[in-house]
């Protein structure tokens, strides 16, 4: 659950390395294409045509791949080099045209308008890009803007334009030189500060920026420039350089793999034993798989939000201990039976109920179970902010919320009735207790002063009961109406008197 769009992404210090991986894949392939261009660009006939057209053809193919994957496999389209190649190749083509004196601004006026239009495109891409349709078509804005931006600051032979003054000064050039180091260091520094002292205040943000600059400058001068200076002074054969590089890669891979394999033993955190506290899928311990199997012919369809996955280890145990076959469908914000609001009218969730019911109707047998698993209450905290308890309590009882709960109850009642006609039982968990602070972020000496931990963990049980009452009452009404509905009160177990 540490993917690029996971809620936990801001706490993963390695999250940004995937884009570096895509970039390095490009640099493995691109030199071959570029070498053909260098050798054959002055040729006539087939060789000259190949030299000038191979990169544009590959770029067009990549752009189409980006379009197709965006429709059919959006995750692949976002992560893989075939669908991202065109963004990097665009800069290569611009350089090729510049060597032929093409597209170069002929006046300061042309350079200036390209600068500001390019800058506007980049800002528009940052502000309006839809991640559901990225890189195609929304990356076109930022790529086009970057091309115009670069084009505006090349040497025009027209004296010192505003573009040259802005972006060819010593500070801008130096920032460009250390830009790789800036990208490499900024994310782990920000992630570690989020884990420890926090990154909420202006002072903390300035500290993060300062540390990023210091680490970037140090790695640039000692590593990037240092290696270049050392290589120029030492007479090392190309074979030795390649062999040394491969050795470093192998050792780094082995060391990193070993580090991750043993991270639970190396961790300084009290939360290192994720089997105890982290509910996501773990191998079940101490289970005699031949002990029961009393539900060997039964199936359970778990349909919900992220809490459907939070039950993974428990469901795995049920499968091994009782023999029940478990199918887990986590639908995020479109979870069925969430009870806080109707789903069918929620933007982006239209048709979700019908799709899931079709799956159940095709697979389920009489006596099977559908488990609607959701949180079903408001949070007092999320990954990024604290919520005022009194405002949250008021929200749980205001007229708009009560109306949404009523419509959600009607919607869920229809689903339960349809399942009853199939002979399928329904299990719904009552709202669970919520904390004032996330334990996995506030349990260690190095993060207890984090602003996210300032309220501590304790919450009055009466407050939680009061906040959950509208949803609980609505579920109890459903329970009285439908004989095939079972309510699971885990609140009383997790928060006893």
Stretches found by the model and what they are:
Residues 1-233, 248-251:
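Membrane-interface helix/loop caps of multi-pass membrane proteins
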Residues 130, 196-203, 213-214, 221, ...:
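Extracellular/periplasmic envelope-modification machinery, especially enzymes
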């Amino acid at each position: 659950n540490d993917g690029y769009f996971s809620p936990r992404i801001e706490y993963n210090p390695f999250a940004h390395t995937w884009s570096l991986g895509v970039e390095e894949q490009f640099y493995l392939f691109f030199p071959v294409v570029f070498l053909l261009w260098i050798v054959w660009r002055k040729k006539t006939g087939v060789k000259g045509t190949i030299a000038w057209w191979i990169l544009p053809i590959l770029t067009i193919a990549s752009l189409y791949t980006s379009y197709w994957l965006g429709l059919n496999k959006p995750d692949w389209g976002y992560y893989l080099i075939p669908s991202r190649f065109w963004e990097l190749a665009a800069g290569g083509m611009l350089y090729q045209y510049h060597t032929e004196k093409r597209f170069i601004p002929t006046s300061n006026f042309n350079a200036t308008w390209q600068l500001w239009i390019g800058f506007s495109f980049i800002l528009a891409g940052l502000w309006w890009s839809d991640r559901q349709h990225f890189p195609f078509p929304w990356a076109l804005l930022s790529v086009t803007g970057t091309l115009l931006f670069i084009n505006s600051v090349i040497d025009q032979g027209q004296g010192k334009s505003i573009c040259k003054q802005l972006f060819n000064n010593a500070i801008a050039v130096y920032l460009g030189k250390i830009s790789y180091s800036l990208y490499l260091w900024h994310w782990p520094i920000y992630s570690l500060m989020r884990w420890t002292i926090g990154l909420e205040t202006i002072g903390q943000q300035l500290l993060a920026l300062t540390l990023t600059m210091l680490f970037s400058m140090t790695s640039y001068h000692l590593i990037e420039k240092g290696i270049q200076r050392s290589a120029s002074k030492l007479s090392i054969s190309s074979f030795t350089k390649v062999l040394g590089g491969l050795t470093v890669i192998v050792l780094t891979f082995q060391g990193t793999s070993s580090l991750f394999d043993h991270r639970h033993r190396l961790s300084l955190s009290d939360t290192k034993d994720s089997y105890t506290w982290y509910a996501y899928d773990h191998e079940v311990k101490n289970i005699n798989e031949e002990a029961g199997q009393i539900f060997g012919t039964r199936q359970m369809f778990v349909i919900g939000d992220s809490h459907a996955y939070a039950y993974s280890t428990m469901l795995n145990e049920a499968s091994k201990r009782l023999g029940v076959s478990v199918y887990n469908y986590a639908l995020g914000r479109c979870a069925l039976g969430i009870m806080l609001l109707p789903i069918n009218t929620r933007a982006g969730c239209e048709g979700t109920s019908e799709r899931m019911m079709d799956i159940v109707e095709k697979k389920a047998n009489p006596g099977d179970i559908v488990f609607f698993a959701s949180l079903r209450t408001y949070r007092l905290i999320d990954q990024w902010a604290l919520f005022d308890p009194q405002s949250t309590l008021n929200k749980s009882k205001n007229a708009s919320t009560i109306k949404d709960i009523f419509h959600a109850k009607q919607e869920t009642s229809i689903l339960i009735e349809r399942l009853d006609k199939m002979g399928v039982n329904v299990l719904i968990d009552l709202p669970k207790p919520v904390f004032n602070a996330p334990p996995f972020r506030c349990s260690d000496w190095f993060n207890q002063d984090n602003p996210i931990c300032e309220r501590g963990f304790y919450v009055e049980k009466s407050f939680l009961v009061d906040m959950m009452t509208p949803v609980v009452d609505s579920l109890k009404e459903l329970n009285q109406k439908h004989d095939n509905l079972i309510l699971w009160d885990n609140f009383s177990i997790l928060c006893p008197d």
